[in-house]
Amino acid sequence: MFSLILLAVTLLTLAWFYLKRHYEYWERRGFPFEKHSGIPFGCLDSVWRQEKSMGLAIYDVYVKSKERVLGIYLLFRPAVLIRDADLARRVLAQDFASFHDRGVYVDEERDPLSANIFSLRGQSWRSMRHMLSPCFTSGKLKSMFSTSEDIGDKMVAHLQKELPEEGFKEVDIKKVMQNYAIDIIASTIFGLDVNSFENPDNKFRKLVSLARANNRFNAMFGMMIFLVPSIAQFLFRIGFKNPVGLAMLQIVKETVEYREKHGIVRKDLLQLLIQLRNTGKIDENDEKSFSIQKTPDGHIKTISLEAITAQAFIFYIAGQETTGSTAAFTIYELAQYPELLKRLQDEVDETLAKNDGKITYDSLNKMEFLDLCVQETIRKYPGLPILNRECTQDYTVPDTNHVIPKGTPVVISLYGIHHDAEYFPDPETYDPERFSEESRNYNPTAFMPFGEGPRICIAQRMGRINSKLAIIKILQNFNVEVMSRSEIEFENSGIALIPKHGVRVRLSKRVPKLS
């Protein structure tokens, strides 16, 4: 018995010294490093304790240092945090050849549902990006605009029923915008009318709830996918299944089979992905691209149903969160500054008056103050508070002797850079004018809400258009007041900035001014 205890103590002691030496990796290399990392979670200890989301845990490290680059530990994995905006842009764009992969979990062979455009590596990513780019041309987005507007009108109709004829009512505008975004994505990607306003328990909303379940397992698994992909790969190879991905696969399979059986064609992203499966490409011609096309057997390598699902899944999960949050945060911030709210509401009224009471794709894109407001929102509340890459070849940090070894995870605290007074004076103040040509009160190098370089978000224009449309619909039909002037508290799980208690405002009915 004593021998077993002694053996256990010896093994634990050896393990401790091994980990301690492991956590001296950056110090041994003479690299500036974060000195408060705890074993075994590194700077993510607060994520494991469910006190902070991953993005805000990284932000805490950002604000405690003044170094351009900093050695950190993500779980037990040495990584590099970049705090300098110029260097961040170099990593994402000019020096892309050294950082062309995100380094997150992907297993094309054994887990094709993981092979989405966000996760894919090397040539696989380049090929998928090339195939998907035609999905997001101006012509394609314009053809989907009427679908988005119909859903915006359903949102307005729902709120009109909920609000009293006179006076204000408290509303969680984030919940409203999430329903709007889910319906937009379900319709413009899958061609399905789920109507989350009237049917809140639909299968798409359930997918979001499942993906967001706030528990320790999800926190740990999310960290592994991003930070320790080898462990995530091992789990999937021994039989672990992603219930959200499998549910999405079933939806895609049923929808594709129904369309092909009945010859149904819709102007949505899934139709383009079906075309990609059948022909190996998406037609640049916007009229042809939505037709049913087949290719002769053996001429073109097509993609699988699982690959279609992987792309639809990432667009759905990422799109519904960023679209809904951007619209909700914009309305919340405007409500705190009545003069800004009135200015944008006037722009909405003027645009409607010039276009016979309608918002068109072209008129939306001409609304200058709306664009400034959305830019300031995604500056203060970036859709992803961190940007991640993997060093794909040894890289010497410019103007230093520090070398980032191949295979090292690289993290950019976008939330940190966007909230740094060095780049954005008075960063906690919501100031759309900082982006105007007259003021230009910010460092353009530091503004990277969708990333930068070849891996910049492929669907950024689609997201911005749908967010702007939602804002227009609300300001056209409702008056908005803030409940209280306070900063939003965020959930302590996941990566995105998800409000812990919703985003609450007061709405009342409004008669649009069309002249």
UniProtKB/Swiss-Prot annotation:
Protein family: Belongs to the cytochrome P450 family.
CC terms in the record's Gene Ontology section: endoplasmic reticulum membrane
CDD domains linked: CYP6-like
Species classification: Eukaryota, Metazoa, Ecdysozoa, Arthropoda, Hexapoda
Biological function: May be involved in the metabolism of insect hormones and in the breakdown of synthetic insecticides.
Class of the enzyme per the UniProt entry, highest EC level: oxidoreductase
Keywords annotated in UniProt: Endoplasmic reticulum, Heme, Iron, Membrane, Metal-binding, Microsome, Monooxygenase, Oxidoreductase
Cofactor: heme
Subcellular location: Endoplasmic reticulum membrane; Microsome membrane
Disulfide bonds: none
Membrane topology per record: Peripheral membrane protein
Residues annotated for heme binding in this entry: C457
GO molecular function: heme binding; iron ion binding; monooxygenase activity; oxidoreductase activity, acting on paired donors, with incorporation or reduction of molecular oxygen
Protein's organism: Drosophila melanogaster
InterPro entries, A to Z: Cyt_P450 (IPR001128), Cyt_P450_CS (IPR017972), Cyt_P450_E_grp-I (IPR002401), Cyt_P450_sf (IPR036396), Insect_CytP450_Detox (IPR050476)
Protein name: Probable cytochrome P450 6d4
Predominant subcellular localization, coarse grouping: endoplasmic reticulum
Keyword set includes Iron: yes
EC number: 1.14.-.-
